[in-house]
C-alpha cells in the first residue's frame, strides 16, 4: 500500500505544505531549506536504530554503522569550526543549551544573558524558560542610542551580578558580536562564557563572522538556520570539558540519540565544508543588506540598529498603522512569511509587538540575489502602506508568488 493510500490525511497535508513552501517567500530568520540528501537521510532506516551512548561506547548491540555515521558528523563539525570537542546528539538548540548549563552550573547559580527584547533567546534566562527557573537569571540589554551591545555596560552589570556564567549570542541581533570582549568580561568576574551561535553558525563556518570556538568555554548551536541542516543541536568546546558535556547530554538530559537526524547533520556539515558554501553565506548577507536599505529609505519603517552585518534584521513599525502581529498576518495574506518581533524596550505584549524580524537565509538557498531581495522588500513596503487596499494587496500577492515560483527549492 502506498503512503498516499495508507494515510491520505497526512499525505495531503505534506503535499500542501510542499506547495506552500514553493509558492511563498520565506523570510523567517530561523528557517531554511535543506538539500534533498539531508532530507533523504532523515527518512532513512537509521530512524529504526536505538544507540544510547557514544560512538564505539554504546549500551546496545548492532551499532557498528550508526557509529560510523555519528563519528563522521563529529569529525566534520570539529573541522568546520576548528573545535577540539564536538557533540552532535542534542535534539535541539534549547537542549544543547540546557546541557551546557548542566555541565558547568548548579541549580541556583547566576547567569547573565541577553534579554528577549534586546534580541536574546528564551533559553538565555527568560523567566518563562527553564533557564530562568533553574538558575538565577539576569539579563543585559542594548545601548539605547545605537541599539547595539554596550560592552562597558555589560561589564559593569557583570561586576554587580557576579554571575557564574555569561551567555553571549542572540536570536534577533543584526550586528557583529565581539566574543573577545565577552571573554574579557567573563575573565574579570570569574565566570564561564557560553556562546549560543545558533543563528550565525553558517556565517561563522564561512569565515564571515568572528568564531567563538576557542574563545568561549562552551559553544552551542542549532544545525538548521544558516547551516542549512536538519533541525537539531550541537555543542562545541575544549577537550578538557568533554566528559562533563557528554554526561550532561547522555545520560543527563537525553536518552537515545536520533541517528537519522545525525546522518542529516553529517551531510549538512559536509556541504558546509565545500567552497561554494562561502558563496552562499556571502549572498545571504548581501541580500539582507539590500533589503535593509529599502526599508531605511522609507519615512516610516526603520531598521533597528541601522542595518545588518548578518542574515537578519528587525523592523520598527511604530510609525506605521500596524503593529508586529498585524504586519505578520498581513504579509501572510500576500504569500510572504515573517514573524512578529519585540523591539528594544518593547512596550507591547510579546503576542503583539512593535516590529517584525526579517531573514534571508531561506530565500538565498532558493537562488534569490540582491535584485530579488530588493523586490521583496519593496513588496513588503507596498503591502504595509496599502494594508487596507484589496486591489493593491492582490497585486502584491501575485508578484510575490510569481517571484517565488521562479526560484523553486529542490
Curated annotation (Swiss-Prot):
Question: Which residues make up the annotated site Plays an important role in substrate specificity?
Answer: 224
Its BP terms in the Gene Ontology are:
glycine biosynthetic process from serine; tetrahydrofolate interconversion
* Enzyme class name: transferase
Pathway the protein contributes to:
One-carbon metabolism; tetrahydrofolate interconversion; Amino-acid biosynthesis; glycine biosynthesis; glycine from L-serine: step 1/1
Q: Does the keyword Cytoplasm apply?
A: yes
The gene is: glyA
Keyword vocabulary terms for this entry: Amino-acid biosynthesis, Cytoplasm, One-carbon metabolism, Pyridoxal phosphate, Transferase
What family is it from? Answer: Belongs to the SHMT family.
**Name of protein:** Serine hydroxymethyltransferase
- Which Enzyme Commission number(s) are on file for it? 2.1.2.1
Q: Which residues carry this modification: N6-(pyridoxal phosphate)lysine?
A: 225
Cofactor(s) in the UniProt record? pyridoxal 5'-phosphate
